[in-house]
Amino acid sequence: MDMETETAQVKVIAHIRSDFSTKFGIPRQSGLVDELTARIVFTPPYRSQAALRGLEGFSHLWLIWEFSKARREEWSPTVRPPRLGGNQRLGVFATRSPFRPNPIGLSCVRLAGIDLHTPEGPVITVAGADLMNGTPIYDIKPYLPYADCRPEALGGFAPAPAGARLAVDIPPDLLARVPEDKRSALTGVLSQDPRPSYQHDPERVYGMAFAGLEVRFQVEGDRLKVVSVERES
């Protein structure tokens, strides 16, 4: 075997359907916004009820997926984590950067439901996912608390969530434009401060695509105010 050219093939078993049509605004890690729900729709070869037998006994799942919008021809051994302001380089294997030799992501999500009888076969609903709509999924595995939870673990340069949650102000007339079942998720996403960590201009207006809407907002101090909500073009 030639280790210089060794490769492997993986199969896309499913795609996720989420409220994010672009990368901006997606929580930086899974589980930060539990109100976010997404659906896992299997590709035709894997639309098997039998493949999900026993899954209902678990509360959380691991998703193994592809950073499909972050492909690069060449990889770099160091990257600039946004958490550090984009100015400091760390080894790619010491980060969760999408720009990796293999653009593979790993997310822990809550199992919110299983519908075995849909026109597209069995569909899994999950909560707390940090994936863009259409992201390819390579595998699904159950989360095992006794093996996967390590209270003694160290978090390196990211021992805790970045910064405090923002207070979110959505004027009533704008909130009325958001479907009722999406309001708590939108508030949760905005409270995480979707801005790049190096941008703090209180006059700047940011736009985020969410659930078919274009949500524009400003941030001043620890307060985020939504200034417009329109249908996504």
Where are these regions (language model features)?
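Mixed-charge, low-complexity intrinsically disordered regions
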Residues: 1-104, 116-125, 129-233
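Conserved positions in beta-strands of structured domains
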Residues: 17, 109-112
